[in-house]
Amino acid sequence: MKCPYCGARDARVIDSRELNGGESIRRRRECIACGRRFTTYERVEPIWLMVVKRDGRREPFDVGKLREGLRLALKKRPVSPDEIDRIVATVERELQSLGTSEVPSTLIGEIVLRELKQLDDVAYIRFASVYRRFADLEDLRREMEALGWRPRAAVTVDETS
């Protein structure tokens, strides 16, 4: 590993720690030549995936697009950025485990829905409404009932008092 300070090629590892549940490794290194310390990160290089859209178009898998969709679904919800990272890592891991170079966008959507369903019902409904293209409130009601939601009894107002 090349030292960022002096350019020497020899450095020794003085500490290693797993990050993100083993998804990456942080290493503290010390340059043999100048003695200065620096940090490097290692991560398995993701497999280059093409996403096959519903209309048949193909585009490269974009983790930023996935993260943005999750951010929008989870906006103003009590969910930490670490949870978003966990979902992104889960999606990437499951897609890579397929061992294929193309994945349907529907598979990505279903993995995200599964993870959101376990995490936050509101975020799940937000994501599902876009992903499943809810046409009307009836679609929304059906999805909410599938989550176990039941409508409240109608409340009548007594106008005589």
Curated annotation (Swiss-Prot):
Which BP terms from GO are recorded? negative regulation of DNA-templated transcription
Superkingdom of source:
Bacteria
Which keywords appear in this protein's UniProt record, sorted alphabetically? ATP-binding, DNA-binding, Metal-binding, Nucleotide-binding, Repressor, Transcription, Transcription regulation, Zinc, Zinc-finger
One GO molecular-function entry: zinc ion binding
The record's comment on cofactor binding reads: Binds 1 zinc ion.
Domain ATP-cone span(s) in chain numbering: 49-139
**What are the residue ranges of zinc fingers typed unnamed?**
3-34
* Cofactor list: Zn(2+)
Tell me the protein family, please.
Belongs to the NrdR family.
The task this protein performs is described as: Negatively regulates transcription of bacterial ribonucleotide reductase nrd genes and operons by binding to NrdR-boxes.
Entry-linked PANTHER family = TRANSCRIPTIONAL REPRESSOR NRDR (PTHR30455:SF2)
Please give the name of this protein: Transcriptional repressor NrdR
Organism field: Thermomicrobium roseum (strain ATCC 27502 / DSM 5159 / P-2)
